[in-house]
């Protein structure tokens, strides 16, 4: 899963920029609202809401904002009704893309996405065109400074660990089945081991390695997509060559 690890490294380095962009809280509020609408406002019985709240809190969202988003989802406060729509397509160098959106206007969203893709050497595809290349998994990152590889594997083998990616120089990436992500988090919490970026992820079965030039083009497209307020997440099967990794890390 080296491609996943390198991509996760770039995503972590982008996180500060993404937050400054100003639309991070908008995306988090949408996710909380949708999760509360679908599964109720009690996070103890709603894993998706619990994960959304944890993500919001890790990004310093005030509890008042979180509670308002929950109440909008449960109908206690008036709010926008969001439709979740997933789009698929291809970017530069044939990279597969899955784009998850939450929108109150489907026509606007698809028009915006087509415009962004066409301006960045990409194109939208039909439903199912690339989804078969990905698996939905749980993932989280554990700093090397918090635990050894042996300790981490021993701790999580009975908590749903499927794969442990060690390619990142600072983090282990833990991969689980979706249903086991909460068990992995609980095991780490009980052991007092810090972790970051716990989430449901789309992980490709195979990666396409890109050189620095193509990687920069794909990153430009992904940045443009993620800047759109209707886009909640973008997934790709891009793997970074060492030259691309060094270039994007500068």
Curated annotation (Swiss-Prot):
GO-annotated molecular function: DNA binding
Spell out the protein name for this chain.
Answer: Probable transcriptional regulatory protein Cag_0165
What family does this belong to?
Belongs to the TACO1 family.
The record lists the organism as Chlorobium chlorochromatii (strain CaD3)
Q: Which Gene3D superfamilies match?
A: 1.10.10.200, 3.30.70.980
Keyword tags: Cytoplasm, DNA-binding, Transcription, Transcription regulation
Family annotation (Pfam families): TACO1_YebC_N, Transcrip_reg
- Cellular location(s): Cytoplasm
